[in-house]
């Protein structure tokens, strides 16, 4: 979500001064340095924490009631009202979106609590109820909804009956820091990567499917004993279970756990990897395939939801349920140089079709339509 918000801020910078004034209001201090480098007017919010807490509590109320109550009770709503904006954009699925006095554009990144309810991080009883309340309000109480893809648009329409003309696909783009980063000798010394490897950057949530990936690696190594895998992500969630499985399968030297990787180092992994392998169950789309393509790294990915919409013919696809299909794709790319060259070329071409300037242009179109409707 942070990367999507970064893309929005950059896009709004290209709009500011063109018959509109853009103000960025923020509560998280992580945004301070980001906005210091932006030409946009940035306003730190004094009541962010309390206001966010109240907004979440008001999720239990009907949307119209929550809006009335928030005007009187929530100091953050009153603080934002003093900025006298005609339209707000909330990029992080915020509960505050439908509680504002002014029209607001919501963002819905995914509805996996509905489509992949077997995973506790999205579909446990409590998590489902909280997400369902939030997203139903976002879909039906906002002036418009941003989604990542046509698949995301369809999910919102199927789930909540939101009118088609209120939902606007605004796909993710790869972060600029990937193409701007310069690799130094310190990178090689810090990570000591194998000469040839697959890469998967993901926190160890069950839906990220690390366990099947490790099992697929074990199967692939029966014919490709030099195949190795590098996993990036903090040592939480299913990390211990994944590491234990790797050890049980005799892969302690073939699976490399590098922990959290800062943004400044991420491009180095993509550039050195044989390919990105991403067996996730969640979508509709994801940012890592975009990162890989822009860095010239082939993509192997789950054939789920909007993945084909995002990657087209620039990826190899497999069922995330099937260890056999995952290791089949990994084995196919491991030795086939022509295939790898073809995927790199197609990935770079696909990445060139949707860049920051395209994102900027699409956002201007969306804002024009929404402002015309709410004026």
Per-segment meaning from a language model:
Residues 1-375:
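Carbohydrate transferase catalytic cores enriched for Leloir-type hexosyltransferases
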């Amino acid at each position: 979500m942070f990367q999507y918000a970064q893309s929005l801020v950059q896009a709004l910078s290209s709009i500011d001064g063109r018959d509109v004034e853009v103000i960025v209001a923020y509560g998280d201090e992580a945004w301070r340095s980001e906005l210091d480098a932006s030409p946009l007017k940035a306003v730190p919010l004094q009541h962010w924490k309390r206001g966010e807490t109240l907004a979440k509590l008001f999720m239990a109320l009907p949307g119209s009631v929550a809006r009335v109550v928030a005007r009187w009770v929530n100091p953050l709503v009153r603080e934002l009202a003093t900025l006298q904006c005609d339209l707000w954009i909330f990029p992080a699925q915020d509960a505050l979106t439908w509680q504002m006095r002014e029209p607001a554009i919501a963002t819905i990144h995914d509805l996996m609590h509905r489509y992949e309810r077997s995973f506790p991080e999205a579909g446990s009883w409590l998590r489902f109820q909280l997400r369902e309340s939030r997203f139903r309000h976002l879909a039906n109480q906002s002036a418009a909804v941003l989604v990542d893809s046509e698949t995301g648009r369809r999910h919102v329409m199927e789930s909540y009956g939101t009118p088609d003309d209120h939902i606007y696909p605004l796909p993710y783009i790869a972060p600029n820091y990937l193409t701007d980063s310069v690799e130094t000798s310190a990178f090689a010394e810090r990570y000591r990567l194998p000469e040839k490897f697959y890469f998967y950057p993901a926190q160890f949530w069950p839906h990220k499917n690390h366990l099947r990936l490790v099992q697929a690696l074990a199967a692939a190594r029966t014919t490709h004993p030099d195949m190795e895998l590098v996993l990036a992500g903090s040592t939480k969630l299913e990390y211990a279970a994944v590491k234990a499985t790797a050890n049980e399968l005799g892969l302690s030297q073939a699976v490399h756990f590098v922990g959290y990787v800062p943004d400044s180092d991420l491009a180095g992994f993509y550039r050195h990897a044989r390919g990105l392998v991403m067996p996730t169950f969640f979508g509709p789309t994801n940012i890592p395939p975009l990162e890989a393509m822009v860095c010239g790294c082939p993509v192997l990915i789950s054939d789920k939801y909007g993945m084909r919409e995002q990657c087209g013919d620039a990826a190899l696809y497999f069922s995330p349920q099937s260890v056999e299909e995952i290791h089949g794709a990994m084995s196919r790319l491991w030795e086939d140089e022509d295939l790898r060259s073809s995927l790199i070329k197609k990935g770079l071409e696909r990445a060139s079709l949707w860049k920051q300037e395209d994102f900027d242009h699409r956002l201007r179109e969306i804002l024009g339509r929404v402002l015309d409707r709410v004026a």
